[in-house]
C-alpha cells in the first residue's frame, strides 16, 4: 500500500512539474522517495538477515530530494519537453511499460548467466528452495526430483538461446515503435548495448582483460540468427510482435530451465558474489531472474487488450 502511494506521489510530482509548480513538485517527489524507502526499511523488520537503518532511509530521502532538484533543472532546460516530443514521434502512446522493461534489460544482463542474454533461469533454484521448504513433510513426496534430469546445452542450443534472448527485447521494442525507421534504428542500438553490457559484466567478473572472452562461435551464430529474424520482423504489426515475443520467451525459459549448470557458470557466480561489486549484485540477480516473466505479463496484457492506434 505504501509503495502504491509512493508511485501515486511520483506521478503527481511529474504532473505538477509539467504544470509549472516546481516547488510543489519537488516536495511531492521527495515525499514519494521517503515513503518508498520507509516501506522497504519497514519490511526489513520481517527478514532475519536484514536490519532496518534510519541512516539508509535518510540517505534515500536525500537522494530523492536531489533527484527532484535535477528534474527541475532539466525542466527549465527543456530536456523533459524534448524527451516528450521524441517519445511521441517514435513510440506508441501507451508504451510506458515497454519502455520501463527495455530500460531495465541492460541492468538484468549484468549478473552472470548460464547463456549470454539467457535471463530467467530459475528452475534449479526454485526446486532447491521447494526441497528445503517441504523437507520432512508429506509434500516432499510430490517433488519429482529424480525425473528432472538436466543436460548441458549443445553449441547449437546455446546459439538458439542467445538469439532468443536478443529477440525478446527486440520484439518488445518493435511492438512499441511507431515507424519502420524507428525499428531500423533500434536493431543496431539494441545489439550494441547487448555487446557493451555483456562485456562489462565479464570485466566485472574476471577483470578488464577478459571483457570479450565470452565471445565464441555460438555467440556469433546467435547474433547472426537474431539479426536475420529481426530483418523479417521489421514489417510485422505491433500486436504480432507481442505474440512472437511471448513465444520466444516461452521457448527460452523452457530450454534454459531444463539445462544443467556448467562448472564455468558456478565459477562465474562465485567470482561475482565474492567480488567488489557485491553491494549491487543482488539487485541485478533479481532483475535477471524476473525480467522475462515481467515481459511475459506485459506481452499478455498487450495481446488481450483492445486494439489501439
State the predicted function of each range.
Residues 58-61:
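Long, hydrophobic, well-ordered secondary-structure blocks that form the structural core
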